[in-house]
Amino acid sequence: MDKRILLVDDEPGIRKVLGIYLADKGYEVATAENGEDALRLFREAPPAIVLTDIKMPEMDGIELLQRIKAERPETEVIMFTGHGDMDLAILSLKHEATDFVTKPINDEVLEIALKRAGERIEMRRQLRDYTEKLERLVEEK
C-alpha cells in the first residue's frame, strides 16, 4: 500500500505532533498549513490519503475535499473537526470523505480511520487487478 499521507491543518502544533505520530507509524508525511498549499503538494505527488482540518482560513476542508475528489476520486480523505460541528462532518461525508475524526484527536480513533482507508485502497487495487486479469482472458479467447 502507498504509505504517503498529506496532512493539512492551520495549527502548527497539530501538524507537528500528528506528523511525528504518522511517521512513527510508517507513513511518509507531507504537511500543508492551508488548502492552496495542500493542492499544490497534492498535484506534485498525489498521496493515497489526505488528512485535513475542516475549519481553515481561505479554503476550508470541505472545498479542499471537493477539489481533491474532482481531480482524483480514489483519494481517501479523512476530515478533522475541532468544533463539535456534526453538520460539517455530515456534509464532508456527503462529499465522499472516507471518515471524520473529532479534535482533540484520539490515537485509536485515528488509527481505525487510517486502517479503514487502507482497506479501501487495497480493495480497489485487488478489484483493478482482477478486472485486468479478466480483460486479458477475454482478449485471449
Residue ranges and their predicted role:
Residues 16-24:
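Charged docking surfaces used in two-component/phosphorelay signaling
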Residues 33-37, 60-63, 84:
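Acidic catalytic/metal-coordinating carboxylates
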Residues 40, 62-74, 91:
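Short amphipathic alpha-helix used as the core "switch/output" element in two-component signaling
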Residues 56:
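Receiver (REC) domain active-site loop signature in two-component systems and cognate sites
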Residues 87, 101-114:
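C-terminal output helix
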